[in-house]
């Protein structure tokens, strides 16, 4: 394959850099939003804020997928505490619900917006976990978010663990309290 047809150059580059792949096929795709890494102590609040922002931007609920790097059980607490309607199966898609599932179950599928939850420091260091994170990230077509509990993993942790991946560093990633911002490249 010599052209990326699923996602933007920015999403493809981030996905590839997670697994330290030196591929450059992503340069042939279209340009879009930069993926956003959100460091927070309140993952549920940020998740709701991102979903609300996506819906306000014109995405339908069916266009949003919440992918856990852990099992579906990891999502259950969040699903029970939110007023949004979620579905946890990929067998039947419901236009009025946001899909919440594990990245492993979502392999081979895609979504306009992917929100990756349950990210921990080990996910950037372990080869198998990086492959799982690549699967989650590469499912996004237009917008990609990583929600990271800053009590578990900091931006410096990720930068240190990702030294071998070209272009993947803390440069350009800014997180603020409940808001997502991405700096322009310097």
What is each PLM-predicted segment?
Residues 1-186:
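The feature marks helicase ATPase cores and/or their adjacent C-terminal helical subdomains
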């Amino acid at each position: 394959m010599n052209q990326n047809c699923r996602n933007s150059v920015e999403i493809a580059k981030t996905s590839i850099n997670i697994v330290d792949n030196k591929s450059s096929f992503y340069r042939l795709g279209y340009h879009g939003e930069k993926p956003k890494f959100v460091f927070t102590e309140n993952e549920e609040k940020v998740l709701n804020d991102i979903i609300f922002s996506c819906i306000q931007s014109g995405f339908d609920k069916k266009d949003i997928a919440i992918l856990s790097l852990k099992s579906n059980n990891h999502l259950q607490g969040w699903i029970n505490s939110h007023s949004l309607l979620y579905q946890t199966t990929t067998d039947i898609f419901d236009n009025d619900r946001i899909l919440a599932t594990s990245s492993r179950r979502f392999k081979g599928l895609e979504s306009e917006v992917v929100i990756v939850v349950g990210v921990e420091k080990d996910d950037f260091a372990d080869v198998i976990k990086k492959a799982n994170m690549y699967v989650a990230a590469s499912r996004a077509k237009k917008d990609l978010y990583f929600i990271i509990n800053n009590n578990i993993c900091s931006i410096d942790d990720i930068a240190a663990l990702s030294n071998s991946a070209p272009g993947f560093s803390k440069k350009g990633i800014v997180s603020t309290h409940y808001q997502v911002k991405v700096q322009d490249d310097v």
